[in-house]
Amino acid sequence: GYARFIEWFKNREDVENARRVANRDFDLQDVELRAVRDAVAALMPGFDTLRIDREVAPPAMVVTKGDVELRLDQLSDGERNLIALAGDLARRMAIANPGSDAPLETEGVILIDEIEQHLHPALHFTVIPSLQRAFPKAQLIVTTHSPQVLSSVPASAIVVLDGFDASPVTSPTRGRDTNAILREVFGVPARLPEQAQEVLDIVRLIDGDRLDEARTRLSNLAELLSEHDVDVLRLRTKIDFAAVGL
């Protein structure tokens, strides 16, 4: 958890500050802390200057997000968890490779269960590429139920687990629409059954040249789903084409 990470970081920063004073070198960086700072920067673009603020009681970890310095308890659970994850992995790699100038390039296997937990959906798209960037020589083995996470990796990197059965993914995933991934990988419909059936019914009305009824049903559906919904737009186009005999 991030509480233990903060305590470790504070202790290391105390050592780093003492060495800076003793060596009269205020650019000196503790190897383990440098690895943590580099990992956080790689995993969380826009975050910088991770440090302990000792002018408050008790001392608190702060980080610069954009142009604003924030305490860790002002961040979302997901942001705090990512900082703790990056810090813990980087710390372990630095400890395992004393004297290394590039501890984040340590080879190893990283296991993460339900990587999307507590993360804002926008971070689902970036968390895997960011981990790969932060720890380029580590093998990641993660579990997820997020179609956004799957859309950030190729199908060849995905295995579907169903009980004790494991099967490959045969349809493309990287860059795919998340509704397609829900349907093709998770086997979950993108819509509630009622709305999915209404879309099919409107298609049948159009194919049967019952355009006025199709327009009425589509207007009702658009009020529910919005005029910008992909199926609403598709059905409007289909009606327009049918009206001119195309």
What residue spans do the PLM features occupy?
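Long, charged, glycine-rich C-terminal linkers/tails
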Residues: 47-62
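Acidic, Mg2+-coordinating catalytic modules of nucleic-acid enzymes
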Residues: 166, 170-246
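Soluble or luminal CAZymes and related metallo-dependent hydrolases
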Residues: 28-35, 81, 123, 194, ...
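Coupling/switch segment of ABC-type P-loop NTPase heads
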Residues: 1-43, 182, 197
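A generic structural signal for well-ordered alpha-helical segments enriched in polar/charged residues
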Residues: 38-42, 91, 133, 223
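Switch/communication elements of ASCE P-loop NTPase nucleotide-binding domains
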Residues: 58-190
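Accessory N-terminal region flanking or inserted into the helicase ATPase core
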Residues: 31-36, 44-46, 62-73
